[in-house]
From Swiss-Prot:
Protein name: Holliday junction branch migration complex subunit RuvA
Subunit structure: Homotetramer. Forms an RuvA(8)-RuvB(12)-Holliday junction (HJ) complex. HJ DNA is sandwiched between 2 RuvA tetramers; dsDNA enters through RuvA and exits via RuvB. An RuvB hexamer assembles on each DNA strand where it exits the tetramer. Each RuvB hexamer is contacted by two RuvA subunits (via domain III) on 2 adjacent RuvB subunits; this complex drives branch migration. In the full resolvosome a probable DNA-RuvA(4)-RuvB(12)-RuvC(2) complex forms which resolves the HJ.
UniProt comment concerning the protein's domains: Has three domains with a flexible linker between the domains II and III and assumes an 'L' shape. Domain III is highly mobile and contacts RuvB.
Function in brief: The RuvA-RuvB-RuvC complex processes Holliday junction (HJ) DNA during genetic recombination and DNA repair, while the RuvA-RuvB complex plays an important role in the rescue of blocked DNA replication forks via replication fork reversal (RFR). RuvA specifically binds to HJ cruciform DNA, conferring on it an open structure. The RuvB hexamer acts as an ATP-dependent pump, pulling dsDNA into and through the RuvAB complex. HJ branch migration allows RuvC to scan DNA until it finds its consensus sequence, where it cleaves and resolves the cruciform DNA.
Residue ranges, annotated region (Domain II): 70-148
One Gene Ontology CC term in the entry: Holliday junction helicase complex
Primary site of residence: cytoplasm
Gene name tied to this protein: ruvA
Origin superkingdom: Bacteria
Amino acid sequence: MIVGLRGTIIRLEPMYAEIDVGGVIYGMQMSLNATSMLQTKIDSQPDAPVKIICAQIIREDAHLLFGFCEEIEKQTFERLIKISGVGPKVAIAILSTYTPTHFAKIIADKDIEALKKVPGIGVKGAAKIMVDIAGFFAQLLQSQEESIAPSNNLKYEASLALQSLGFKRNEIQKVLEHIEALSVSEIVKEALKRLA
């Protein structure tokens, strides 16, 4: 089973990438968000190898490879395809429309209208996804809370604010460890200085 690849991107399209790993070229489907992140990495370091997290689906008629830049996106994809009626195509469409963090907020807010904006999802499908994936995000949020010292609500709220701005959770945690608890806005301002 292929769980990750490190190599050179030789072709990058909006929802598809090819990576050369020691002379073997792998093609994979990716979300628009993932290919955008990958393009940013390539633009900043054109000759540096990239690492792509993978999910592999083997069927009678095809071996499919899906690529992700973040573990949370892969976990969300794998959870989505376990829902009856949601295949890889719809899961990638969801992750192309919304980042995992934004998608989690949609689920928490029970915003069926936002979910219906994803190509291939109707009212019934949106309702089913809402019910079936709610527990997944509840567990995910709980594990995030535990890893960011839940006793400190200010830092937790600051972490959520910084995540909504697109910063990665592990980067945020490192910075927040060195900031004294003031107010949420002061923590966010100080963290932004250090993350920039």
